[in-house]
């Protein structure tokens, strides 16, 4: 039959847990929390019998007792009582002294360790980021930045999501001056409309007519929150958001197609399909811009779609055949 021996030891006051309570003593150490350590050992006072072989089968000694901390709910023991209990327990069970010493050293080290994690400083982050850019890129490539000072002539216009994980310059290694980038929720392109979404319209017009980009590239990505919203928001009824629901419904045809073709599949799988179908809807919406259609007919502009999977580290690229041809006169 085994008995349980217990002793109380103080824990540092910075420990925070809902199950812990501060000591109610009024002494200078009243803010210290008490911990109860319990060890199980045999009640026999005789020393353990050495291992021996019986029928050529090894007999192993019982494992050494382990001190396990159990936080008391009341925390009534004072600092002095905890130390006295510890001393008494170690006198009675000297074999536990190394284990207790190691545990105390651990607690002491935790209490003495400085908090090395400095609070986040956004201004310092911006400053250090620019210094790194200037010293490693700007200063080391003067020819590029001298040329960019004269103007820009990017080959790509890129629509990408605002998601912080999918920066196209990072993912596709675009260099400064190489891509004219528009980022918004779920990388969507609304149809041509002079009364709304003028920010997107202005960007497309400027890129095609003034910058003379050669490619318009719409990039979707994995685990897109905007696409998940599109798949889960009700199609009808009042909105629960001021802007998001109205915006993502730009690609409502993609949702309808996915629901029709993948009905019964898991939502996550539907979202993956919708991430790609929404890209196709945006590519189709680009055809509603007259200057985009003109560029396609004249072979001065091309449209492509893509999907970046940052979970698996893959990238898909595709083009759509819109069947456009130059007008003919009869």
Curated annotation (Swiss-Prot):
The keyword Cytoplasm applies. Keywords: Cytoplasm, Lyase, Zinc. It catalyses: hydrogencarbonate + H(+) = CO2 + H2O. GO terms for biological process: carbon utilization. Residues 1-109 are annotated as: Chloroplast transit peptide-like. It is an enzyme of class 4 (lyase). The keyword Lyase applies. GO terms for molecular function: carbonate dehydratase activity; zinc ion binding. InterPro entries: Beta_CA_cladeB (IPR045066), Carbonic_anhydrase (IPR001765), Carbonic_anhydrase_CS (IPR015892), Carbonic_anhydrase_sf (IPR036874). It is found in: Cytoplasm. Its main location: cytoplasm. Its EC number is 4.2.1.1. It comes from the Eukaryota. GO terms for cellular component: cytoplasm. Reversible hydration of carbon dioxide. Homohexamer. Possesses a transit-like peptide, but it is proposed that this peptide is not removed and that therefore the enzyme stays in the cytoplasm instead of going to the chloroplast. Belongs to the beta-class carbonic anhydrase family. This is Carbonic anhydrase 1. It comes from Flaveria linearis (Narrowleaf yellowtops).
């Amino acid at each position: 039959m085994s008995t349980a021996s217990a002793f109380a030891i103080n824990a540092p006051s910075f420990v925070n847990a809902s199950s812990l309570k501060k000591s109610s003593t009024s002494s200078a150490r009243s803010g210290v929390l008490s911990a109860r350590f319990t060890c199980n050992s045999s009640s026999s006072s005789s020393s353990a019998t050495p291992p021996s072989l019986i029928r050529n089968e090894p007999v192993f000694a019982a494992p050494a007792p382990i001190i396990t901390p159990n936080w008391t709910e009341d925390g009534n023991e004072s600092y002095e009582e905890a130390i006295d209990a510890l001393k008494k327990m170690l006198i009675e069970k000297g074999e536990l002294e190394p284990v207790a010493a190691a545990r105390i050293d651990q607690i002491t080290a935790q209490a003495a360790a400085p908090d090395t994690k400095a609070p986040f400083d956004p201004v310092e982050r911006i400053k250090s980021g620019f210094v790194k850019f200037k010293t490693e890129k700007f200063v080391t490539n003067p020819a590029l930045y001298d040329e960019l000072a004269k103007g820009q002539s990017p080959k790509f216009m890129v629509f990408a999501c605002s998601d912080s994980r999918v920066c196209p310059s990072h993912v596709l290694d675009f260099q400064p001056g190489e891509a004219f980038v528009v980022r918004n929720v779920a990388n969507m392109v609304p149809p041509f409309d002079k009364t709304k979404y003028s920010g997107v319209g202005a960007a497309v017009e400027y890129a095609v007519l003034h910058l003379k980009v050669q490619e318009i590239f719409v990039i979707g990505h994995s685990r897109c929150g905007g696409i998940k919203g599109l798949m889960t928001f009700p199609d009808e009824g009042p909105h629960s958001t001021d802007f998001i629901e109205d915006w993502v419904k730009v690609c409502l045809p993609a949702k309808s197609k996915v629901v029709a073709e993948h009905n019964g599949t898991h939502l996550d799988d539907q979202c993956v399909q919708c991430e790609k179908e929404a890209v196709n809807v945006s590519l189709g919406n680009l055809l509603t811009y007259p200057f985009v259609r003109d560029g396609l007919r004249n072979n001065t502009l091309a449209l492509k779609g893509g999907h970046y999977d940052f979970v698996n580290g893959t990238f898909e690229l595709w083009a759509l055949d819109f069947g456009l041809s130059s007008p003919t006169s009869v």
